Amino acid sequence: MENAHAKTAEECLAFFGVNESVGLSGEQVRRALEKYGHNELPAEEGKTIWELVVEQFEDLLVRILLLAACISFVLAWFEEGEETITAFVEPFVILLILIANAVVGVWQERNAENAIEALKEYEPEMGKVYRADRKAVQRIKARDLVPGDIAEVAVGDKVPADIRIISIKSTTLRVDQSILTGESVSVIKHTEPVPDPRAVNQDKKNMLFSGTNIGAGKAVGIVVATGVNTEIGKIRDEMAATEQDKTPLQQKLDEFGEQLSKVISLICVAVWLINIGHFNDPVHGGSWIRGAIYYFKIAVALAVAAIPEGLPAVITTCLALGTRRMAKKNAIVRSLPSVETLGCTSVICSDKTGTLTTNQMSVCKMFIVDKVEGDVCSLNEFSITGSTYAPEGDVLKNEKHIKAGQHDGLVELATICALCNDSSLDYNEAKGIYEKVGEATETALTCLVEKMNVFNTDVRSLSKVERANACNSVIKQLMKKEFTLEFSRDRKSMSVYCSPAKASRAAVGNKMFVKGAPEGVIDRCNYVRVGTTRVPLTPAVKEKILAVIKEWGTGRDTLRCLALATRDTPPKMEDMMLVDSTKFAEYETDLTFVGCVGMLDPPRKEVMGSIRLCRDAGIRVIMITGDNKGTAIAICRRIGIFTEDEEVSGRAYTGREFDDLPPAEQREACRRACCFARVEPTHKSKIVEFLQSFDEITAMTGDGVNDAPALKKAEIGIAMGSGTAVAKTASEMVLADDNFSTIVAAVEEGRAIYNNMKQFIRYLISSNVGEVVCIFLTAALGLPEALIPVQLLWVNLVTDGLPATALGFNPPDLDIMDKPPRSPKEPLISGWLFFRYLAIGGYVGAATVGAAAWWFLYAEDGPSLTYHQLTHFMQCTHHNAEFEGVDCDIFESPVPMTMALSVLVTIEMCNALNSLSENQSLLRMPPWVNIWLVGSICLSMSLHFVILYVDPLPMIFKLTHLDLAHWLVVLRISFPVILLDEALKFVARNYLEA
């Protein structure tokens, strides 16, 4: 049923053709079940394991590697002699890498538990209904409820469907609907229609929403929506419709993979075509097919060389290390790629309650009447320090510390706060903090009494548990609470009836203490308390009091004010009819006004500094809250989102004002605004969508079920540690301490991680460029193989992988939070950097080929060939006069290959040092600024020595031992790469950046 909240109870009953006292007939239930289905949320269709596995192989680079492995495997079958084992190593290793990558990918996907499944926990098991087949109320499975059912709910129940209240069977009906609307206090419900068809859920005071909890009272209503048609069901549908976009890094790597695969394919084909003339060379036994297969193997080697196989593992390791560092700062990252996304966050949309504020109501101001002379009235105003539930803080008057017990008015004010109160403080020893037991507003009053300590109770020797309610206990020993007149909407107040606890104090007599909304309470006051006496409340005095309350409620602070009053001579207890709540207002008359307290949910201490940091870092902070606009703007001013006297028109909107704008203006509003008040969850999703249309990278905080769709839609969904399971499972990050400052620390960490990732991605890519150049040169010049695929795999995975991982530990730049967020469209490798890595890669390739050629041409233990002989080695036979005196087996020697591999590994280690900083010289940033890098270089070189000198590894890798003379040549060829990169950095620093 649409807009049930705007209809009368009678209209709702007529719509479903049902009688409140009888309920639906069996036939009506059957028809409704056919029409609306069962009252449950459909389960999410998950992907099968097979679908997840196939997904892992959709990446182009992975497919090229898979093809290379299959081809190598087929070619290995046709190998002869002792090379058979070596031939099988390569496809086996490639397959192992692919399987490991797929396992990690599938495991990560399976681990991201489904937020839609978590919604199920809000579905109650049972419901209570009236139906025509039974005279009394009956319990049925909640899934069998249908629209039109007459349902009953009572304190402690979970609401089983969306229900329009028909009648309330208790004084009040309080509902905790925080999971759905984010309201921090329970809401009082009524039965009258809400005439606004566009009312937000917070304003639908005659509706009960599925999954929310009844805090107090009992009611009967008619079910108006079940299953996916409930408010919680709409959230489920919105989440199911939200597609998860790829993170900026994933998009970059995908683009890079596509470009790389095209380049690889071109080079492989080129190498094969260049050598068509060599297919018939004698070395292939004159067989054109064997020659074609030989060069096909070289093309496969090229593919293996060009793909940085170690990259996925290094990225995962770097992100995992980043998540550990973030966890230490209370930011628990649930999805690894989002660590990097945090680095480009340009807008943070933050909830107010609990994130920017403490979510611990505290009284910060109060006043009592000092003097009344005729129509002139002067007030004593006090301020109170301390912004949490901890009973620590001072009472100040004109910025000076005072003892509250010296003011009679404050003693009575503290008495009312302690007795007219059903809440208390509790010290949580596990967390080491004070927490509320009961309503936030009342707990603030309990805390105020502790700070005031009007009877000078000695609290120094008490434990924290005893300290929680020490001063309240003293007051409660003086007066005994007989009964409570519950809060009701019509009078907007509550009261307690108290009698003196001891016979000695009988002279005081019984009292009624009242607290409530100032207008309602003051209207029922006839007197004002001045010291220990009372004087009549004249219109002028009343006006003065209300003026101060209005100023407190609308000024910079927008405090929530409560008036406190006493009825000095209440009726006798036996004369009061407590069963009839309509009489309560009558008993709360002839009151004496005692004072007023102003409270607020105070901003967290560290938030102002964090917002300043965001501004310096070019990040816009938008506050989104369910509170009213005045309060929202006041908090924005207090924490620095708006300055004290900044004009906020066009920069702050309520949900209703936002809805009234045409779509183009809504989009523009999202570009300018920094504050949205009185919003619904759908607004949050809309705001995220509009921000994304400006290419903003948005972080969105939330804690309720209602926030889940927006959390899922934003690039970075941030759930509160104290939030619901649904919010947590829909988010990328959870704040263990619910603190806004933690988000800013996480953004800083994300920026540092991205900078380091850029360094190691570039390091690995320049290494691969070197390997490609090496193989291309050997094929193009007709030289013997310098490197084979199994060696390339070893270098890509192990030797390069360790320093690349260590580059993830580079210290962050000092000015990292002084720069604007990087654009998600910024390329991973710019034109200049591409040139740099081509230059470095070109040197790496040429040096590797040069090392192998050096042994053939110039080494003392080498064959001392001519350049012509080396480049035409395929024509070497005993009958060829050009190769007279040359043993053709020399071209199979492992020494030149070992030289080439050793030069490649040593150059890569030098290159890792170059990658400490993008443009800083090694003289400014010496290697020991990242001790992990120094350690990983030592480990990589040690592993290289292992495959050279520990049998049987040299046989598997087709290598041999090198002597000192060889190593000196390796170092001479490798070291210049540092000088080359220093020259390129110098150009970048002095000519490009300038």
From Swiss-Prot:
**Which regions of this chain are Lumenal-facing, per the record's topological domains?**
70-89, 274-295, 778-787, 852-897, 950-964
Q: List the disulfide bonds.
A: 876-888
Q: What is its EC number?
A: 7.2.2.10
List the membrane topology term(s). Answer: Multi-pass membrane protein
Which coarse location class describes where this protein primarily resides? endoplasmic reticulum
Q: Name one GO biological process term.
A: intracellular calcium ion homeostasis
Q: Please give the Pfam families that the UniProt record associates with this protein.
A: Cation_ATPase (PF13246), Cation_ATPase_C (PF00689), Cation_ATPase_N (PF00690), E1-E2_ATPase (PF00122), Hydrolase (PF00702)
Q: Where are the transmembrane segments?
A: 49-69, 90-110, 254-273, 296-313, 758-777, 788-808, 829-851, 898-917, 931-949, 965-985
**What subcellular compartments does it reside in?**
Endoplasmic reticulum membrane; Sarcoplasmic reticulum membrane
Q: Which residues form the active site?
A: 351
Q: How is its activity regulated?
A: Inhibited by sarcolipin (SLN) and myoregulin (MRLN). Also shown to be inhibited by phospholamban (PLN) in vitro. Enhanced by DWORF; DWORF increases activity by displacing sarcolipin (SLN), phospholamban (PLN) and myoregulin (MRLN).
What does UniProt say about this protein's domains? Ca(2+) and ATP binding cause major rearrangements of the cytoplasmic and transmembrane domains. According to the E1-E2 model, Ca(2+) binding to the cytosolic domain of the pump in the high-affinity E1 conformation is followed by the ATP-dependent phosphorylation of the active site Asp, giving rise to E1P. A conformational change of the phosphoenzyme gives rise to the low-affinity E2P state that exposes the Ca(2+) ions to the lumenal side and promotes Ca(2+) release. Dephosphorylation of the active site Asp mediates the subsequent return to the E1 conformation.
Instruction: Name the protein family.
Output: Belongs to the cation transport ATPase (P-type) (TC 3.A.3) family. Type IIA subfamily.
Q: What does this protein do?
A: Key regulator of striated muscle performance by acting as the major Ca(2+) ATPase responsible for the reuptake of cytosolic Ca(2+) into the sarcoplasmic reticulum. Catalyzes the hydrolysis of ATP coupled with the translocation of calcium from the cytosol to the sarcoplasmic reticulum lumen. Contributes to calcium sequestration involved in muscular excitation/contraction.
Name-wise, this protein is Sarcoplasmic/endoplasmic reticulum calcium ATPase 1
The organism encoding this protein is Gallus gallus (Chicken)
